[in-house]
């Protein structure tokens, strides 16, 4: 219940993500699939690095920087995607941003994408899209379920694609991973 209330008020659950028991081993296979979608020789920044399993599966030619709301070890850039202002990541430091099950927890996805366009040309991500269309009893139940997870938004697949396309990205690849979709977007 506390998670629903915090999510309703759009608060990042820092305590939850500081507890390593809330970073599940089953997510490693998702990160392995995401790493396979990252082009070789990429300079990668991962948002929501967790246990940093993505780093293990990236092509050795890639460089990697973790970021998260809590410290995840050496080199971690610590900040919250729900706090403003978002940090300056420096000019020409990264090519690829990876979001593994993170965008659901972001309050203002359009603002984060606007910020991100200054820093990367490729986004590799997973997202658990909303299924219900428009206001309905089913939509209300789905929203409650998403709040229980701590998710702060309810984008359907086509809405998420549009958010990226409106910012100059084009969809390069997408596929299923369990109940989520894996996407690769590249700037035109």
Predicted segment positions?
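Acceptor-substrate binding/catalytic loop of class I
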Residues: 139-159
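A SAM-dependent methyltransferase catalytic signature shared across enzymes that methylate proteins
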Residues: 157-174
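Core SAM-dependent methyltransferase catalytic element
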Residues: 172-188
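Hydrophobic adenine-recognition pocket in adenosine-nucleotide-binding enzymes
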Residues: 102
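Conserved beta-strand signature within the Rossmann-like core of class I S-adenosyl-L-methionine
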Residues: 120-131
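A short, conserved alpha-helix within the catalytic core of class I
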Residues: 105-119
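Conserved N-terminal segment of class I S-adenosyl-L-methionine
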Residues: 1-92, 177, 181
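A conserved beta-strand element that flanks and buttresses the S-adenosyl-L-methionine
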Residues: 98
């Amino acid at each position: 219940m506390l998670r629903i209330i915090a999510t309703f008020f759009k608060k990042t659950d820092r305590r939850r993500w500081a507890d390593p028991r809330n970073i599940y081993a089953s997510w490693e296979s998702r990160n392995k699939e995401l790493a396979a979608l990252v082009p070789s020789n990429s300079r990668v920044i991962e948002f929501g690095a967790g246990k940093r399993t993505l780093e293990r599966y990236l092509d050795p030619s890639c460089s990697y920087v973790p970021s998260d709301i809590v410290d995840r070890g050496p080199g971690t850039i610590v900040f919250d995607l729900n706090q403003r202002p978002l940090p300056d990541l420096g000019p020409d430091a990264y090519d690829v941003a990876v979001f593994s099950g993170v965008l659901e927890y972001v309050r203002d996805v359009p603002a984060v994408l606007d910020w991100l366009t200054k820093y990367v040309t490729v986004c590799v991500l997973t997202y658990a899209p909303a299924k219900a269309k428009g206001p309905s009893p089913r939509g209300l139940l789905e929203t409650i379920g998403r709040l229980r997870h701590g998710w702060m938004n309810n984008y359907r697949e086509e809405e998420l694609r549009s958010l990226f396309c409106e910012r100059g990205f084009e969809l390069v690849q997408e596929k299923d991973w369990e109940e989520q979709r894996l996407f690769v977007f590249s700037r035109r």
